[in-house]
A protein has these predicted regions:
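N-terminal extracellular ligand-recognition/capping segment immediately after the signal peptide
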Residues: 1-61, 67, 72-91, 104-105, ...
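Small/polar beta-strand repeat architecture
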Residues: 15-17, 25-51, 111-128, 136-143, ...
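Flexible, charged surface loops at secondary-structure boundaries
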Residues: 12-13, 58-65, 93-94, 140-142, ...
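Core solenoid repeat modules with strong leucine/isoleucine-rich periodicity
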Residues: 140-146, 156, 170-174, 243, ...
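Extracellular beta-strand/beta-solenoid scaffold signature
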Residues: 34-60, 81-89, 127-130, 183-196, ...
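Extended amphipathic secondary-structure runs
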Residues: 1, 62-84, 189-234
């Protein structure tokens, strides 16, 4: 019958189910619907698209019955960044192949998507090329923040931090930055944020639109891992970033037949702030993608990459305007 039902621990149902009423469960309690595993069933159960997606994803990583989550063609209104690891709090690593497919994520609201910005002082040495030491106010510096400062190259991110030791580990080393200086740390907000995972491998996103609405960025990868695969997806109007790697979870990453649509079509090329893709690892493959009018299409730091059959352009409406690289 209709009503609200409180389930205090994990529940697995191995028969087909049709849910009436609403379920209330602790965040750490999985609901595994082995014979009715799709997003629509979870929405029926929890009456909230965001919560239903989190619980369905939790089940995906806590059950061997399915390798993929079908979003049932649903459009999920997202009011704040989805912390994918927090949805599966019992796991910080996962290496079995898993897929999310067939739906749309739609950013709504405003304040939840605002950047976190921290200004700090830290010391850098070439002897430890990916570490900042004696970092002031380190507790407030978020993992995944973009780092800016003297000697900091493009797309350098906070991969991890050690608050007790006052040390920040970076995605890449710096150049000519020895000594103590001021750094700016800016944390963008993403529709799907995997950065809470220490390691995530063989994970795939397929046939999904990420409707960022000039509010959110698209996807942030885990800290480490390999063969993240995104194919036949649309990342539409990301405010700052489309697909971000803060570590080496992009090792062997595959981006196939995806469409990156800018939020800045009428902005001069030199004034744009959005970047479609960055990667730090090796063996990245970008194939048959389309991207228009970002500051850069892709920033690739590794080696042995394949960039094939892509169509990207950076132009603006200014006669003899400044050109910026599509690939760097």
């Amino acid at each position: 019958p209709e009503g609200t039902y409180h389930i205090t621990r994990g529940l697995s149902l191995s028969a087909p189910v049709q849910i009436q009423g609403q379920l209330v469960m602790p965040d750490d309690a999985p609901l595994v619907l082995s014979k009715s595993y799709n997003l629509s069933t979870y929405i029926d159960a929890f009456k909230s698209e965001e919560l239903a997606f989190k619980k369905a994803f939790q089940a995906l990583l806590n059950s061997g019955d399915h390798d993929s989550l079908d979003l049932s063609g649903r459009s999920i209104a997202v009011s704040e960044p989805i912390d994918m690891q927090a949805a599966v709090a019992n796991r910080t690593e996962y290496a079995q192949r898993r897929v999310i497919r067939n739906g749309q994520f739609y950013a709504q609201g405003d304040t939840a998507w605002e950047n976190e910005v921290v200004n700090s002082v830290a010391t850098y040495s070439q002897n430890t090329p990916k570490v900042l030491k004696n970092v002031v106010d380190i507790a407030n510096i978020p993992v995944g923040a973009l780092v800016e400062g003297h000697g900091v190259g493009r797309e350098i991110y906070v991969k991890s931090k050690n608050v007790a030791a006052q040390e920040v580990t970076l995605s890449e080393g710096l150049f000519d930055a020895d000594g103590t200086q001021n750094f700016n740390f800016t944390r963008f907000k993403y529709l799907l944020d995997f950065s809470g995972f220490e390691k995530l491998s063989k994970f795939s996103l397929q046939n999904i639109e990420f409707q960022c609405n000039s509010k959110a960025s698209g996807i942030m990868l885990a800290r480490t891992g390999y063969v993240f695969h995104i194919k036949d997806c649309f990342i539409t109007r990301p405010k700052y970033r489309g697909l971000t790697s803060i570590g080496t979870a992009c090792q062997g990453m595959l981006v196939d037949r995806c469409h990156f649509m800018t939020a800045e079509p009428n902005t001069k090329s030199q004034d744009r702030i959005s970047i479609a893709i960055n990667a730090n690892g090796n063996d990245v493959k970008l194939r048959e993608n389309w991207a228009s009018q970002f500051r850069h299409f892709a920033i690739l730091s590794g080696s042995n990459n394949i960039v094939s059959g892509n169509h990207f352009y950076q132009g603006d409406g200014v006669a003899n305007g400044i050109r910026l690289a599509g690939l760097a």
